[in-house]
Design a protein with these regions (language model features):
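Catalytic cores of nucleic-acid ligases and guanylyltransferases
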Residues: 1-201, 206-305
Length: 305
């Protein structure tokens, strides 16, 4: 996200270029009292102030999808903006200077803003922590602790890097925790859109509960174009029922599904929800009886909690 203040006006933009001021009025109001103009790159999180860690990412959706949240909602889902980088200050574009120098500027202004007692921003704004591993094994230790903090891993940045748009290789690197995985049975397919129009590319997967298959996740990414076309042909030949654009399928295909997080969910029949599910392998070597169960999913959840 980018948090911007220019000429007295504060705006909060998502990565998808959506203005979300109305969803987070407390942040906009607090930052409007800062006298400096700025452009900050960062992340918005629902924050556990007692433990000083993020709550699960899914809770942020309860704020983003709600305009003009009531005071009770703001208290129930308290947010914080964590600044990663300072891109502009008082009209001066500093994206071309080294990251380590931008960090010095960020820390200087954060200290200045924080010391304004009439506008304490510490309850809604902070800057990200820096870590300096002594070697790769040490970095691995930090990475593995990320899941305990409800984060996906580390971002490694060159100290002399500029701030640029797009995916620039060799400047910043995401060092993410290894995904969790379950083998699941394909039970539904839905037609794609855009370049994938005319092909079945959106899939739903199930896990066993006793002798019944219960849907637990949907995914649309991970297969190669050749695999998509091969699976599309199979889907058309093995449809049980049609529900508008959705087809119910013979339970014969097993896929390895990877995801970043698993948690209890009362909204789903399975009782669980996963974050960022995607297909990582078509398990043609497995029969549906080899697929994982909901019991396996709950065991996985206990292991990481």
């Amino acid at each position: 996200m980018q948090l911007i203040k220019r000429s007295g006006n504060v705006s909060l933009w998502t990565r998808g270029q959506e203005l979300v001021n109305e969803s987070f009025p407390e942040l906009v109001e607090k930052m409007s009292h800062i006298k400096d103009d700025f452009v900050l790159d960062g992340e918005l999180l629902v924050w556990n102030f007692k433990e000083q860690i993020a709550f699960d990412f899914s809770l942020l959706q309860k704020r983003i999808n709600r305009k003009s949240p009531t005071r009770s909602i703001q208290i129930k889902y308290p947010i914080i903006f964590i600044a990663y980088d300072l891109l502009e200050i008082n009209g001066r574009d500093i994206r071309e200077i080294k990251l380590e120098n931008r960090r010095i500027e960020l820390e200087k202004y954060f200290s200045k803003w924080q010391n304004k007692t009439e506008n304490n921003i510490s309850d809604i704004f902070k800057i990200c922590d820096l870590i300096f591993p002594k070697d790769w094994p040490d970095a691995l230790t930090y990475k593995e602790k990320s899941r305990e903090n409800n984060t996906e891993g580390l971002i490694i940045k060159k100290k002399n890097s500029i701030y640029s748009f797009g995916r620039k290789k060799g400047i910043w690197w995401k060092y993410k925790v290894d995904p969790m995985q379950l083998d699941a049975v394909l039970i539904y397919a839905k037609g794609g859109s855009g370049r994938r129009a005319g092909l079945y590319t959106d899939y739903s997967f199930a896990l066993w509960k006793d002798k019944e298959l219960i849907k637990f996740a949907s995914a649309y990414s991970g297969l190669t174009n050749i695999e998509i076309k091969e699976l599309d042909k199979w889907i058309r030949k093995n449809t049980i029922e049609k529900f508008g654009p959705v087809r119910s399928l013979k339970p014969e295909m097993v896929f390895e599904i990877s995801f970043e997080k698993i948690q209890i969910s009362n909204r789903h029949k399975s009782g669980i929800a996963v974050r960022f599910p995607r297909i990582t392998k078509w398990r043609k070597d497995k029969k549906i009886n080899d697929a994982d169960s909901l019991e396996n999913a709950y065991e996985l959840m206990k292991k990481i909690s």
